[in-house]
Amino acid sequence: MNKIAFFLPIVACAAALILGFDYHYWWAYALIAAAAEGILYLMFYLNNSSIEYLSGHIVRLEHHYPWTERCEKSRTVGGKTERYVSYVDHEDEYIYELNTGHTGSIPEKEYERLVRLWPTYKSEIHVQHRHCVSGGGGEEIKWNGDESITETKTYTHRYRNPLKNSYSVNRGQKIKKDEAKALGLFDYPEPVADAEQQVVLVDPDVYYNGNIDETNRELQRLNAFCGAEKQIHVFILLFPSNEGSQIAFKQRDYWKGCNKNELVVCLGVNDKQVDWCETLSWMDNDALNNEVKDYFRQNYNKNLTEFVKWLRAHLDNWKRVEVKTMKTSSQMSLGSTLYLWISASLISAFVLLCAYWIGGK
């Protein structure tokens, strides 16, 4: 039923011809309808997509040498247009590449630090720059495989989320930001530029007699070294144990069912002791969820860093659900359905108005 909404701009274009608009401009009507379809699809995609977090580790570094670019420009002087040439100097650029293929800029100090740590040799590379008149070139160095001497990074990726605006059990109730704050729920931690994402989140009322920074770093490494292969991103959330395990499901609702690659381990902590554990994910198979709960039943007072090491060795039972196999995408919520039809109607009205302006009689 909702798919019909995407045909409304085409119907508006056909209506323009039926109403007697100049048919010689049929190509203009078609272009307007095509542009309208693109805008409608983009709006629908953004409304039904989510941002997930992906992690990786640096496997290659590049240093691009300074270079000078020749630019041809035009300007108007005394009513006449004349062309002139200017030169732009570009400084050194330092680039990292992750095992996932993602690339980005890296500060010079971090580049130099990693180069000193890596026992491999630099090699010259040819760097292509448009309109380069001097300088250029560069060098690269590759990681040798030692986990202890590389860095991890986390970045965002947008994907179609069939749970976001559907009548899915996993989606849960809608919780607003102020309500979440009152309940003591966590916001998604954003990756920090040139640093990493905090993946162990601790409620201010929790007293945990352990090294959170150490656990956080160990979990960042799990996400970076196992994330691409296992399609997983793990968070650990520490709540006061007296909140009860129901707070974990409110957290799931606030995070809109979580993301497809996430395993969220929620723990009720009282000093050194873990009183309860709940896991949140899209998995159909509960094997790993049950293993995690069993771990904390038997190791309720163990250091969380040891748990992360244990989890890394037990990821064989993790399998991310494929979005294409989910059957919720056609079961849109009432709000999303109204949003789609109102948007399609307004865009179609705009198509008809443009057609009238071009070929109306």
List the model feature ranges, each with a label:
Residues R252-W255, N261-E278:
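Catalytic nucleophile-His microenvironment captured as a short glycine-rich beta-strand/loop
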Residues N2-K250, Y254-K260, W282-K361:
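A structural boundary signal for the start of the first folded domain, especially the loop/turn
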